[in-house]
Structures are given as C-alpha cells and as structure tokens.
Amino acid sequence: KYGWDESEVCSFTNQEYVINSTADGAQSFINYFIDTQKDFVLTCQLKQQSGTDKGLFGMFWSSGDSYYNQFLISSRGEYVVFSGDPAQIKTRKKAAVNPKGNVNKLRLEARSGTWSFFLNDELLETQKPLPVFGSALGFIALSEMRLTVSALSLLQDQEIRLSPDAVKNKKENLGSLINGPEDDLGPIISTDGKTLYLARQNSAGNVGGEKDDEDVWFSTWEGNQWSVAKNLGKTVNTPAADNLLAVSADNNTLVFEIDNQLAVRYRTETGWSSPEKLDLKFENESDHFVASLSADGKAIVFSAMLPGNVAYDPKRNENDLFVCLKQEDGKWSAPINLGSNINTVGEETSPFLAADGKTLYFASNGRPGYGDQDIFSTTRLDDSWMSWTAPVNLGPQINSVRFDAYYTVPASGEYAYFVSYDQGYGKADIFKIRLTKGNRPLAVTLVKGKVLNKKNNQPLAAAIHFENLRTKKDVGEARSDPKTGEFQIVLPFGVNYGVRATKSDFYSVHEYLELPAGDQYREVKKNLMMVPIEVGETIKLNNVFFEAGLAVLRAESSPELDRLVQILKENPTINIQLEGHTDNLGTPGVLLKLSEDRVATVKSYLVDHGIAATRIAGKGYGATRPVTQGNSEEERLLNRRVEFVITKK
C-alpha cells in the first residue's frame, strides 16, 4: 500500500509497522530516489519483540537486484554496515544495542562526502559513500522474529524539475474494456490514435493461458470508446513471452524482442509475417528490453545494459537509453549512448520518441521524483543524439509514489497513455490523460492515403518514401497495407516533399507535397498512383522543375530524374519518348521551342547519367495538349509538365 512492496507477514498494528519474519527473513521497502552524492539523513526507529538475539535487523537504501546497502543490528549487541550480497555478511562489530523489547534508533548522516553511522545517537563509524545498486529504501529482518518499526525518515534537499507546462488534467483509467485483473503493460498508441496495443501478462486469454508470461493484445477506437481488448492471435503470440516493443508510423510493421534481439513482422493480406531479425550488433546484459521506433523509421531508441552505460556495473541490472540509426545502406549503426544529461546511475527505461522525432519520453528512478519510476520528457537539440534539454518531470497528475512508465502519444498529441500501479483496477493498469498545447510534442502533419494501380484502381503493397526536395534526403519511409493499400506517415511542417512508392514492375507517379509552416496538428490525404511498366503507358514526371521561361533544371529536379535513370538501368530493354508541354502564356512558336528545349535538357541529363541516347526519343508539344483549361495559375501549373511514354519493353 502507498507504494510499499511488502508481503503478507507485514501489517500495521497500534500505529506501528509489524514484520513477522520467518526463518528466511522478510523485508518491506519503497522505491525512492536518494542522491548519494549530496547530503542526506536517513533515520529508522525499530524494536525486536521476539526471536533470537543474534538475528540481524535494520534498514537499507539505494538497493536492488539482491544487492543492498544495509545498516543492521542484533539484540546481543552487534552491528553491521554492509554493501553487497547479504549472504556474504561475516563480520559483526560490537555496539551498545538496546535489548529486545526496546526501541533502537539507527541514523545515517551523509555530509560533505562522509557517511556517519549512529546508533541511539552514538557515532559508530564513518565511511566513504557506498555504491548505488537501485532505489529500494526500507527495513529488513534476516531471521525469524517479530519486528516493529515506529519511524522511517529521509531528509534531503531535492528539487523536482517540473515542466512549466506540467499536465494539470486528471488521469483516467481506461477501464475494464482494456484493463484486466492481470498486469496490463507496454501500451503503444498508433500514430493516428486509432489502435492501442498492450501487453497482458499471465492472462487466461493468452495463447498459453495463465502460464503464458506475456501476449500482445489490441483495442480499436470506435468513435466514442475503445473496443474490448482482444488477443492479437497465434500468428504473433506464442505460449512463451511475446514482447512487442514498437509499432511503425504506418501501422504495418511490428517490432519485437526475440531472444534478446530485435525482429520485425510485416502486415500481410492474411495477418502478420514471420519475424525477421534486424542486424543490430549488441548484446543486452539486462533482463529487460524496451524500445521505440522513430516515426520516420530511421532510429530505434532503446533501454539496455551495455558496457557503454554511464554507470556500468556488471553486478547490477541498470539500464541506459541508447539509439541505433539506420544508415544510407540500410544497415543499423552501433548503439549510441544518449549521454549523461539523460542517463543516470539509476535505471532509465520505457523510451518513447514522439512523432516529431525530437521529444523523448522515458521513465527513470535516478533523479528526484514522486516515488518509484517517474516519467520525464526531454527534447533533442541536434542530430548527434547526445545533446538534449534537461529532462523535466511530467508532474503529480501523471507520476505517483508507485511505478509509472510506458508513456505513449499519438501524432495529434491530444491524449497520452501510460502505465501506473496507482488507482488501478487490477495490478498495473493503462491510463490516459488529456494534454494541452503546452505539454504536447511539436505539431506535425499526418499524411494518409492509399497506393493504387492507376490502370485498375486496385490496392497495391508498396514501399513509400518521402524526401526533402531541397536537401534531396529521404526523410521518411512507410509500407502500404497489402490488403487495402493504406499507408500513413508523419512529416514536419515548413518543407516541400517529394512522395513516391516503389514496387517491382511499376513506375511510381511521384507527387509533390508542400507543407507550409504551422503549429497545429493536421491530416492530409494523398493517394499514390502507380503505373505498370507497359508499352503505351504515359507517365508524368511530377517533380521536374525548370527556371521560369527557361530550359534550365532546378536543383530539386534531380531526385525525380535519378529515379528514372534507375528504372531505365534496371530495365535495359525499355525505350521511352520524352514529351514536353507548356501553359498557354506566350506565342505558339515560342512555347513549342521551349517545350522542345526542355525535353532536350531532360534527355541530356539521362544520357549524362549513363542511359544510351538511342533509347530516348523526344518531342515538344508547346501548349497544344493541355490537361486543364488553363484559366488559373493552379490549372496552368498542371499543364506545364514533362512526361514520358514507354515505346518498347
């Protein structure tokens, strides 16, 4: 209760905390951060009521994973200050311990880098600061006895660094449609906010029943409420633990942890593919692995224990946050530690990189907070992934004295979802909280659409790429649903993009997408039509741009023309005819000459990049073949174009 981890042998009686320890010992603790590099005072008042006089009892702090920092006494007049595995305690020192049935006061004073241990206000010894093994703080009996505790206090000057826009709304439990009596963990909200994935532990509804450690479940938004959570099925879940780490922005790729490695499953027409392992070269030494896939698919932020940890110690399970970046050749980089501005001697876990690619949420017990793991946020400052703003605590409406983690936000930033043991229906439950503008990630655009065969309007499975036309760099990738052709991708404002889909035996019609600067989330519809590579097909080069009134290519035309070069190289038997068209502003002769010159410029580009001139014919039509009336600038823009016709395959 109140965040304490305790067993059935612990209870409150007559305003005292009672531990009826067995021969195996018993303990009760709360997870609470102590900055051991700063001054603090830890005090405990306890009394042995019964049991052997030689049994040790006392307090512990900064402990975890079977390693403790302990100040213990026995009723026969002994004390121990110990750091490590309690099973290794061998040496006891004499002290004036009050006999059984009387209160003893233990006090640790940490001042100016020296730790002083007092018993009943008498100094026993001083030491240098002991190591940090975790955040557990509590009291313990190592043998059979009845132990009562009347006080435990920690005094330390700690500042909880709060966001100036900390959430003030109340959190809401998602209720019994989502949460069961078991642990419900690891929520992942889809980018569009319409699907919620979660992990359910030891549920009768798991593929392996109640003995199944973890299955993936999901729920869909039905307009005014979430549907009843369902098991994702046997194509994904097994009788063993199935650990879903991330979902791609297009909702068509799932990232799993399998045998301590990352693997992906792709959506198929009938469900999900078999897992394919990603070539990430590291070996996580921790029992836990949590990750987040960036919206552009080019970064995986994860929590792991590696030799590169800020406070690496093979004796304890302490995770840091790392990132692996997808390189131009499709391979993944070695892990990059996110740095000491984020990682601490404590544990950092459950990272979630928001759709803006810059705002990172994570849980930590290594910095001042409200209790156990608290949720924090930080913002990436550059592309090194090691420069971040100082993390801020998300505040008491989200964080409690208990475990709070697994924060996840859709692209809209309207709601956040997270896990807490506080105020739950069962054990760990999933909550939501409405966000206001000041505590949302940066606003983005969600582009949604379908990939279709232009000839028959049928959906296609394809890879979709978005590129910044100014920098010529890919800025996002997605996959379309093989059954429906649907895709979605997140893009920042203030950039002009080229959008294309790739599929064998098809030529993508490349679309131009202009996203002016803005600070409000919005959704844009954009279907992508793919043209089958067949004789007689006419294909428009959408992203080929010329200087006004000239046959001079603008720099942002290169990506489109480079892809045509690639298609011609991959299909060496194809011949094409380039066709140039203008708007109707000018004399026919001048417009005809301009269209012919522009065709010649495009042909020269292709030849310069390795395509035989004999494979390329060309013809200019001036303004004689418009596709619109040309009565507005928007219509004239559509008439100004370069196309090519496949003349031989």
PLM regions and their residue ranges:
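A short, solvent-exposed beta-strand micro-motif common in secreted/extracellular proteins
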Residues: 485, 495-505
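Periplasmic OmpA-like peptidoglycan-binding domain that tethers envelope proteins to the cell wall
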Residues: 364, 369-371, 571, 579-649
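Short, solvent-exposed beta-strand/turn patches at coil↔beta or beta↔helix junctions
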Residues: 179, 533-574, 582-593
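Short, conserved micro-motifs composed of acidic
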Residues: 157-450, 454-455, 470, 477-479, ...
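Flexible glycan-contacting loops in extracellular carbohydrate-active proteins
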Residues: 127-150
